[in-house]
Amino acid sequence: ILNAGISMWARFDNITDISLFHKINEINYQGSVNCVYASIDELKKNNGQIVAITTAQALMGFPNASAYSASKHALHGFLETLQMELGSTISVSNVYLGWIKGTNLRANALGPNGEKIGDSHHKHSSRAIDIDSCTTKIVQGIEKNKKTIYIPSFLRFIPFAKLFFRKWLFRKINKVTSEEES
């Protein structure tokens, strides 16, 4: 299970320490690549399963999260490639999450200076899912060997909405993130 992650909350034009891109990519993408690389022979030998706990931001960009979204896009592309290359010997599952209560991901997110922002941005909690409910759904999906798991389930519409209702989707996401900034 690939579950490493560090987030950010800063507009790209407000970033004062560009090294936060390297830091986020090193954890979110390269850390997962390193884990898969170290275990690939064993996974192939035992018809193993790779499960990536990721985010809806792997499917599209998101305001205030340029480095985070980019790192999750990279991970998504890497795992999709593995599925094509090794699909007969290993299984790859992606779990796309929305906001989850109780993870401290937001408190540990990096701000424009590359430092943790702390508890200053938690307005999304009314939209967030309980961590126990989330883990139950993840386990159920893994047991069923699902290739894609969306939590909450409405996230499954993102690829469709991005393709056919792009402007509407971008306006909706911009509205949600601007509410958090105020």
Annotate each PLM feature.
Residues 7-22, 64:
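Conserved mid-core segment of classical short-chain dehydrogenase/reductases
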Residues 38-47:
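A short helix-coil junction within the Rossmann-fold of NAD(P)-dependent oxidoreductases
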Residues 55:
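Residue(s) in the substrate-gating loop at a strand-loop-helix junction
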